[in-house]
């Protein structure tokens, strides 16, 4: 192990506008928002996109998004398919966790340039129906994935707003 860690700096910080539920961003998928941000990070940082070693994105609501939305965002931003990209889901801390993970890989010298952040669109979180066992639809309930996967504590069964007040 080395006695000296690498110096880590942020070359560019970018975000999309904060939208409202079913507002002006309601039809833009999370991976598309992520792709826009990745392109702008590369533009502002003045580094060649071929120098990017890794992309780490935080996202909670992935139902119906297809495999690895972080990779979708990365490739659609024009990055090489050879650049690894992965998704972090640590609920409300997902974007921050991606930055911490990026920091760690840079600190240890595993990468030179890492793009990390978060991507989400709560307006596009689908309602799902468990219909695999061929039950009658009249007995099934739709599940709002925005609420169930993103906003309800899995252990205490209450809204994350209550969790915030309890913390």
Please annotate each region the language model reported.
Residues 14-18:
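Short polar catalytic/cofactor-binding loops
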Residues 59-65:
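Glycine-rich phosphate-binding loops at beta-strand->alpha-helix junctions
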